[in-house]
Every structure is written in structure tokens, then in C-alpha cells.
Amino acid sequence: FRLPTTDELFGDEDLEAGKMNLKPEKSDNVNLSFSYNHQFGKHGLYAEAGLIYRDTKDYIKRGLDVLGGTSYGYYENHGHVRTKGYNLSLLYSFSHWFDIGGTFNSIDTRDYEKFLAGSSLQESMHYKVRMPNLPYRYANINANFYWNDLFVKGNVLSIGYDSYWQHDFPLYWENLGDKDSKNMVPEQFSHNLSLSYTMKNGRYNVSFECRNFTDAQLFDNFSLQKAGRAFYGKFRVFFGK
């Protein structure tokens, strides 16, 4: 079972409308994964592959509507959905100063409600069609450099890079309407950089981050664009023993 989230039930008082009578999702799940982990002297390698199968009733589906010229999201239960997919992960590390890794996910979620809701005779036009407004192929990669005992024993300087890629996907049912004029959530590729200096074995930490340093157009959903290039700084003190 998956209970509805707070936003799904009550909305966010901005761009998400809640629905208080949402039912919990009921799913039968099968997951199969294989992993490999080995250390070759200073070199480390970890690989993992997984298969996913999920049969869901009362699937909580996100939709979009327009009120007064403003788009907003809403949620509703959809009778029957099946999800099949796989994920791949790979991580390489060298000694204690470098690691690089990434993941790739392909998740195919399709409508298996053969007849329209409330009807036992009229067949659905999108039976076995991929669910709309849902990313189905995405990946990420990250790399980190570490300088241990820099300046003072117990201090660590780290520089990190990470990126996220997401395939474009249709806002509405992909089998309806003209392919060339469909509303699409565009392909997205973001890049981030970070710099962190940890002192006194983790008691103090200073970090700086530049998110989306290529200033690419990114979207939370079809109606809400994320911020462009942004810079962040943080200072943390740990008061435990």
C-alpha cells in the first residue's frame, strides 16, 4: 500500500490542488537485483542491475487543468496500472581521493484499465498506453575529488560534480492528437558543482555550490520553470561529542 502524500491530499496552496478522498494505492511488486562489489588494490568497483514489475490498483495519477488562465496540478485515482522497468548503477573509486558513478533508469508505466471508469462496455482509448506527464527515462552521474588532511590533519577538501538527464515526455496521452503539436515536457540536462571543506574531523564544515551552472532551462513540471544558475553557501557546526 502507498498512502497519499500531504500535497496529494491537501495541495500546496499554490500550483497543486489537493483531493481529500484519494484512496491508497494497492500494489503487487516484484523486484530482482544483482550486484557486484570488488576491491583491486586501490581500485574499487561496484555495479548493480535491477528489474522492476509493479501491478497497481487505484494508482494515484497526476493531471493538469487550467483555471482563470493559470495551470495547476491535481491528483486522482486511476483504476489499473502496470509498471515494468530496469535500473543500472556503476561506481568506481580510487584510493580515498576520487570516485565517479552514475545510474540509468527506464521505467515504463502503462494504463491497464481496459474500460472507461463507470462503464463496463466502452473500451478505453488509451488501454496499454504509457501514462502521461510522467518521466520514463532518466540518468545521473557524479564525480568527487577528496584531499585528506589538507593543511591540518583531520581536515578534508572535496570538489564535486553531478548532472541529471531526463528524456522529454508528453504532457497528455501520447496516442491522442497530432504528434507534431503535442505539449511536451522538454528534455533536460542539468550540471552542478560543489566545494566543501571539513575541519576538525567533521565538527565544522563550509560548503559552496553552483547549481545549473550552464543556465539550462529546467522544469519542475510543465507549468513551473526552475531557477536558472544559482549559488549557495553554507556553514555547519556539529555540537555532538
Where are these regions (language model features)?
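C-terminal beta-signal and adjacent terminal beta-strands/loops
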Residues: 1-2, 57, 100, 164-190, ...
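Outer-membrane beta-barrel translocator domains and adjoining extracellular loop/strand segments
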Residues: 5-13, 59-67, 107, 111-121, ...
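Residue-level detector of the transmembrane beta-barrel scaffold of outer-membrane proteins
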Residues: 7-9, 31, 44-48, 89, ...
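Extracellular loop and loop/strand-boundary signature of outer-membrane beta-barrel proteins
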Residues: 14-22, 71-77, 85-87, 123-131, ...
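Membrane-embedded beta-barrel scaffold of Gram-negative outer-membrane proteins
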Residues: 24-84
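Residues that define the transmembrane beta-barrel architecture of outer-membrane proteins
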Residues: 26-30, 53, 80-84, 133-139, ...
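Short coil turns and loop connectors of transmembrane beta-barrels in diderm outer membranes
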Residues: 28, 40-43, 57, 95-96, ...
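Gram-negative outer-membrane beta-barrel transporters
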Residues: 47, 52-55, 76-170
